[in-house]
Structure formats: C-alpha cells, structure tokens
Amino acid sequence: MTQAEKGDTENGKEKGGEKEKEQRGVKRPIVPALVPESLQEQIQSNFIIVIHPGSTTLRIGRATDTLPASIPHVIARRHKQQGQPLYKDSWLLREGLNKPESNEQRQNGLKMVDQAIWSKKMSNGTRRIPVSPEQARSYNKQMRPAILDHCSGNKWTNTSHHPEYLVGEEALYVNPLDCYNIHWPIRRGQLNIHPGPGGSLTAVLADIEVIWSHAIQKYLEIPLKDLKYYRCILLIPDIYNKQHVKELVNMILMKMGFSGIVVHQESVCATYGSGLSSTCIVDVGDQKTSVCCVEDGVSHRNTRLCLAYGGSDVSRCFYWLMQRAGFPYRECQLTNKMDCLLLQHLKETFCHLDQDISGLQDHEFQIRHPDSPALLYQFRLGDEKLQAPMALFYPATFGIVGQKMTTLQHRSQGDPEDPHDEHYLLATQSKQEQSAKATADRKSASKPIGFEGDLRGQSSDLPERLHSQEVDLGSAQGDGLMAGNDSEEALTALMSRKTAISLFEGKALGLDKAILHSIDCCSSDDTKKKMYSSILVVGGGLMFHKAQEFLQHRILNKMPPSFRRIIENVDVITRPKDMDPRLIAWKGGAVLACLDTTQELWIYQREWQRFGVRMLRERAAFVW
C-alpha cells in the first residue's frame, strides 16, 4: 500500500469515528483541546479539590476525602485607617423586616400555622390541644440565670499581632471592639453585591479568594504554589448568574492557579451523591431554598425555582416566638454574632415537626460567650417549637415585606465575550423570521390566478399565519436557549412556566407549594410521576425530627387527584444512605471527579486564557 493510500485510509477511519460519535450524541468540539488526547492522562482523584460554597458554610476537600472540611464562609478584614466606621454584614437580620405591615403579616402567618396544626390529627386520632404563649410567659419571666462557671472557656480571637484578615471561626470570634469589618461574600446563594463597604464585585471576589486559599492551606495542607498540579470541581446554584460564574472560574484558574476546572450544578451533584437517577431535589439551605427536577443527570430548566428563605429565617422566627413566651435571656440581640450562633443552636436542639409532641415542656440551655461567665437558663416552651419550622410552609410568618421572595429561571444576561450568547441568537433568529416572511409574501403574490381562486378565502392570511407560527416557535426556542434539552419540552410546560413567572415571583411560596409547582412544570406525565415518587431533601435547613413524614403528608394532601390515584407511594428521602444531608451535594461533586465521562468536561487554564467564557459553552455539562 502506498503512503497516499495509507493516508486516505486513516482519514477515512477518522471521519468514520467522528460520524459514529455524532450518532451517539457526542458533542463535536467547537474549540479544539489544547492538550492532545494522547497526553491527557487519567486525572487522579486525590489531585482534585471539590468546592461547594454556601451562604453560611464553605465545604471543601479532596475528591478522595470521606468528609469535606466545613468552615463558616466569612472573613474579617482589619480597618486600613483609624476611626474608620465599623461595618458588618448581617446574619439573621435582613431587609423587609421592619416595615409597618411586617407585624400584621407575621400574625396572619401564625394564624395559618395554628390552623394547620389544629386540622391535622395526632397519631392517636385526637386533635392537638393548642398551648398559648401566656401559659409559659409567667413562668419564664421569673427565671434568672444560674452561674455555672466564672469563665465560659471561650475566648475572643487574638488580634494582638494585627492580622490583615481572619477567616472562618476566627472571624466569627473577633471581638466587636476590635477594628475589623465582617463580610459574608455569599448571601442567599449569590455573590453578596451591595453598595456598602466591600460590596463591589472585585471586593467580594477578593474575599472569596482569600477564604478558599486559607482553607486549602490550613485544612487540606496544600501550599498555594502547588495548586498548578491540582484541578477543581466547583458546585454552583441551579439558578446562577452567568457573569458571577465566569468571574469565579477566572479567579480559580488565573488567580488561584488551578490547572483545570469543571463547573456543575448543585442539584445534579446531589443526585450523584445520593445515588438517585431521577428525583425532585429540595435544597433547604441557611438562607435560600431551591427546588428543581433532575432526570438522568439533567436539571430541567422550567422546573427550577429559588425561594429567598431558609434556616436562618426559621431561627429568627423561633426567637420572635420565644419572646412572646417570655424568653428569659433578655439581653439577646440579633445584631450580635454570638447570640445568632446561640439561636441557631436552640433551633437545632428544640424545634421539631412532630404533631404528637404537645403541651408545655421544661428546657434548659447554656450561654458561653467569650470572656464572660457560663450561664444556665431554664425555661418552658409549648407550640413554639413546632410553629417555627412550619413557617417554611407558611412564609408569611417570617414577616418579610417588599422583597422578592421567589425567583424562577430567567433569560440569560448578554456577554460581550461570548459570540453565541442569547442576544446574538435572538437577533439572528429575528432576521431569519423576517426573511421567511418576505419569501412567503413573494410566493403568495406569484401564485397563478386559478390557484388563488381555489384558496380565495385563505390566501390573504396565509403569510400572516405562517409568520405567526414561526414567531411562536422562535419564542419557544428563545426561552430554552440558556439551559438545556428544553427545545424538546412540550409547549404546555412552556406556557405553565410563563404563567408562573407572572403569578409567583411577587409571592412567597410555601415549601410544599414550591415542590408541587416545580413538578407541575415537568413536560410529561411520566416525568411528573417519577418526581412525585422520589423527592430528595438536602441541605441543613429542614433537619427537624419527623420532617420526612410531615413533608410527605403535605405533598400527598395537595398533589393533583389524577396523580394521587396512580402513584403508589410518595417517597420523601431526607437521609439517603444514612448520609448527612448537608454533605450530599459535595459528595456528588467527589463522585463526579471519578467518572470517566468527566474527562471531557475539564476546562484547562491555557484554554481559558485563550478562549475565555466560550469554554463554558463548549465544555459545561449543562447548556450554558
């Protein structure tokens, strides 16, 4: 065989291989990999770092670690000048709480909670007897703390060496009298951009870089100069801001110096971590709750929604309810970091969703603030322990007025660096529509007289009908440009979504209603049936006793009757494989690192430097 014939044979094999890949549905790379396939060795999992950034907690670790390091996602920065005003991002407090209508809304929400508690019978078939706060108040007002020890054992962070910044627990325990600003770089699942000090995009990214770098050095014991040998898997929210994701990827690759990155959505990673292929993911975090339906590794765009409340709101609501019952620790302040930690602890210790626990009960708790005596308080609580977590189902009880409480997946923001962003596609689509209309007009004008006579009643509106069909199709495609496989979704799902945008974005949906809405936006009854049969709850915001049974009862009672007849069981899973629900998404990121298919998803530093955000469109596991 001649050299030319050999070359033709090899070219034929390559073309045949490409054709076979296309038939299998493998994406043809728009941007060729700068690292040849022959040199792309299997990436060792212990050189992959999985990062799951939350609003309150950062979870970070090697893909081979059994558990990640979990640290408060906060930084304290020293004042650059003396006399600089003190600034600290709030934790339990938020905008919209002190409006004139807030208290009335709280009371109305609490009435709905009490009605729901009364309407559901206990396991013995009897109604639950309500306990008024007045029954506990007289006892609690008389209680005084007992001194356990003159030293609590906790100390403020030592700042005598004037560190420029402190991270995690050290930042939380900075003395308020020291000259440090406190920043939480992520709020309600998004970058904490605000008009105050440290609220610019550049400042927030700088805070995140410092926190993550500190965690990698301290907890993973990896020198920052060695990050060029490591790759990163970054978990992002299902409803994400493209600009923010782009900046985070740029920071990880170009500033921190990782050699490669894979970006994936929290919900899909939660399915990997739980071992479920198709499920409705309910992620109840500290500051936001997100719901979406995932099927075979794809997060259905139309089913995604984010609720702007979570565990912190339950803690604040619990404090309000305890105050009504005469909470004996009267110095408690929501602006104090130590008191916020205490309230979170009290919520996790006492709150539940068990209808069978009723009546007044005695409790005690300790206060161990730094450089203060250790105090023991005793007090009584009744229905407050059940009412607070039920606020997740009746969010009016949070008393938040004038804030956007529900977010659905919106059309994407344009990006000048991305030549194929949605704005470009919509503009070219509009030109195609105009061209099609002009062609249709010309064809109708050039028809023979006899033909026109046969269609006399229809010819005048034929181009308009043709154009309207194209426009409808175009709008359906335009709505599905940002996130994947949605061009195949039924028109009914699209209309359901458009109606939802107008109806729900101004309202605070309860958790059960949000789940029902998300499942209802699935494109087929078969998919809806799958989702009703498997609801996975992750995150730390719903870790209450009997939460599984409570949520299951709410979904069963409110789901459409047509599905209630055909679905044998609504399965609510709160601890898959007996795992901590707060770690499931991170664990899924670690599983993702070990999959063979992940090798095609890596974005390398040199590629990002050359092609930028276009690499996300090419390599992301979801449609960018």
Swiss-Prot record:
SMART domains given in the database record: ACTIN
Residues that bear N-acetylmethionine: M1
Keyword Aminoacyl-tRNA synthetase: no
Keywords from the UniProt entry: Acetylation, ATP-binding, Cell cycle, Cell division, Chromosome, DNA damage, DNA recombination, DNA repair, Mitosis, Nucleotide-binding, Nucleus, Phosphoprotein, Transcription, Transcription regulation
Annotated spans, Disordered: 1-29, 430-462
Lineage: Eukaryota, Metazoa, Chordata, Craniata, Vertebrata
Family: Belongs to the actin family. ARP8 subfamily.
Organism: Homo sapiens
Positions bearing Phosphoserine: S132, S412
GO molecular function, a single term: ATP binding
Record protein name field: Actin-related protein 8
Record-linked SUPFAM superfamilies: Actin-like ATPase domain
Family annotation (InterPro entries): Actin, ATPase_NBD
Residues that, per the record, bind ATP: S55, T56, D283, V284, G285, D286
Gene3D superfamilies reported for this sequence: 2.30.36.90, 3.30.420.40, Actin, Chain A, domain 4
Positions with biased composition (Basic and acidic residues): 1-25
Gene Ontology CC entries for this record: centrosome; Ino80 complex; nucleoplasm; nucleus
Signal peptide region: none
Subunit details: Component of the chromatin remodeling INO80 complex; specifically part of a complex module associated with the DBINO domain of INO80. Interacts with ACTR5; the interaction is observed in asynchronous (interphase) cells but not in metaphase-arrested cells indicative for a possible dissociation of the INO80 complex in mitotic cells. Exists as monomers and dimers, but the dimer is most probably the biologically relevant form required for stable interactions with histones that exploits the twofold symmetry of the nucleosome core.
